[in-house]
């Protein structure tokens, strides 16, 4: 369901530098670090507006694309919307004692595989001969304009794998768009809030699923380990991805592996809720998605963060693909007009505050968090709910949604947070 499932870049598409011309000393309008959703989406949007005579996409190949997928809802006007192989026009949501199936119009819920994104990228940048994808690792950047606060360009150091070892090259770039954090100091992984998920790709012996409807959140699953929900994305009447996700709060011990109870709960859901009497498992998707509450990385000179580093993954849901598209389009528009892309990232302080408030409720009072999600999903039309979750709702629409929600859990969680901060004292 969620967006951030790392998979390997297809070796047939990003070519190794040895198969083309030498890179050392070359100059690029942009170097894009990372070939996942953020990097490839940005390349597509740059090509779409006709910006850049030389753009280099560098991916280390350690995170495969083959089994990766992204999901989002959109009205169909996006650059990559037509590349999605799945588009559902209805949404199912459920909880203890209630079940709702609603039309998504004017939205559709779309799912795009890594292979589809890679193919769409090749198609869109195909006419831009200066756009190149290589396998390599960006080791660092030397930003000439960082101290001055402008973009004077960068020298980018790249390690390129070759049959007999690694070749290091330096290239020049007017802009560097970073989705991985090439110049970030490694720090111990903190126990941040995150989503812990396991999904089973199943094929049933009989018709079980409705290919036109996605089950976005079904809370009819065990809640003892934290707020949990089921998700179903059908690909036919007999096949689907059936996934279980748990919110893991900040401060909880990070697991060494995905909770083994997930699979038992998925199997129970298949049989007890969906009525699947016989099925076989054709694949698994497992992982965690950080629900980042810290401020996003900021642009420094010519180095511009993109993707999750730029705050494009929504902290309360883990969705980010549509936000990445909007950011990529904004960057491309700035560059096409001769403006700096440093301010292209939207500032959503209000929505970040709402996300943090909801995460506090999830951590302090999971039962009330379930109630809040149930109210949002069951008492509001899909258009209002999805626009709100997409941070695209009008003030009037937001107020109407808030009027349906219980406010006491938010107030209680806020008071607890303030009390904790006072007890801990000022941060060093």
Please provide the spans of the model-predicted regions.
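A conserved beta-strand/loop capping segment in the N-terminal third of enzymes
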Residues: 72-145, 153-154
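Flavin-binding catalytic cores
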Residues: 252-285, 304, 325-348
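C-terminal helical "tail/cap" subdomain of flavin- and related membrane-associated enzymes
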Residues: 329-428
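Predominantly flavin-linked oxidoreductase catalytic cores and closely associated redox partners
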Residues: 45, 124, 128-279, 292-295
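N-terminal FAD cofactor-binding segment of flavoenzymes
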Residues: 41, 45-97
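FAD-binding beta-loop-beta segment adjacent to the flavin cofactor pocket
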Residues: 224-227, 287-306, 311, 361-367, ...
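A conserved FAD-binding loop/helix module that cradles the flavin
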Residues: 309-330
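N-terminal Rossmann-like FAD-binding beta1-loop-alpha1 element of flavoenzymes
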Residues: 18-56
């Amino acid at each position: 369901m969620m967006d951030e499932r790392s998979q390997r870049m297809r070796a047939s598409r990003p070519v190794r530098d040895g198969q083309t011309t030498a890179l050392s000393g070359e100059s690029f309008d942009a170097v894009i670090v990372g070939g996942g959703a953020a990097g490839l989406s940005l390349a597509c949007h740059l090509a779409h507006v006709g910006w850049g005579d030389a753009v280099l996409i560098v991916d280390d190949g350690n995170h495969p694309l083959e089994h990766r997928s992204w999901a989002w809802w959109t009205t169909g006007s996006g650059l990559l919307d037509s590349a999605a192989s799945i588009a559902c026009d209805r949404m199912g949501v459920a909880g203890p004692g209630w079940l709702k199936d609603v039309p998504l119009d004017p939205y559709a819920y779309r799912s795009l595989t890594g292979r589809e994104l890679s193919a769409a990228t090749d198609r869109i940048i195909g006419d831009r001969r200066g756009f190149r994808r290589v396998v390599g690792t960006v080791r660092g950047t030397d930003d000439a304009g960082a101290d001055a606060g402008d973009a004077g360009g960068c020298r980018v150091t790249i390690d390129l794998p070759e049959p007999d070892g690694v070749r290091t090259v330096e290239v020049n770039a007017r802009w560097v768009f970073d989705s991985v954090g090439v110049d970030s100091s490694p720090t111990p992984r903190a126990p941040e809030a995150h989503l812990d998920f396991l999904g089973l790709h199943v094929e049933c012996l009989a018709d079980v699923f409705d290919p036109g409807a996605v089950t976005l959140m079904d809370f009819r699953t065990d809640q003892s380990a934290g707020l949990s929900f089921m998700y179903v994305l059908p690909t036919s009447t007999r096949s689907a991805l059936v996934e279980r996700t748990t919110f893991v709060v900040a401060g909880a011990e990070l697991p060494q592996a995905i909770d083994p109870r997930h699979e038992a709960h998925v199997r129970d859901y298949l049989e007890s809720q969906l009525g699947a009497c016989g099925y076989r498992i054709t694949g698994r998707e497992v992982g965690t998605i950080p629900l980042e509450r810290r401020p996003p990385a900021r642009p420094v000179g010519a180095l511009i963060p993109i993707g999750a580093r730029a705050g494009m993954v929504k902290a309360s849901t883990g969705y980010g693909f549509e936000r990445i598209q909007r950011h990529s389009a904004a960057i491309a528009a700035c560059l096409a007009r001769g403006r700096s892309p440093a301010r292209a990232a939207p500032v959503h302080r209000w929505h970040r505050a709402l996300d943090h408030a909801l995460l506090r409720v999830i951590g302090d009072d999971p039962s009330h968090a379930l109630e809040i999600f149930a109210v949002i999903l069951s008492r509001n039309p899909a258009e209002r709910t999805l626009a709100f979750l997409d941070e695209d709702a009008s003030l009037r629409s937001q107020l109407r949604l808030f009027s349906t929600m219980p406010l006491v859990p938010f107030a209680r969680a806020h008071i607890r947070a303030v009390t904790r901060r006072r007890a801990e004292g000022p941060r060093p």
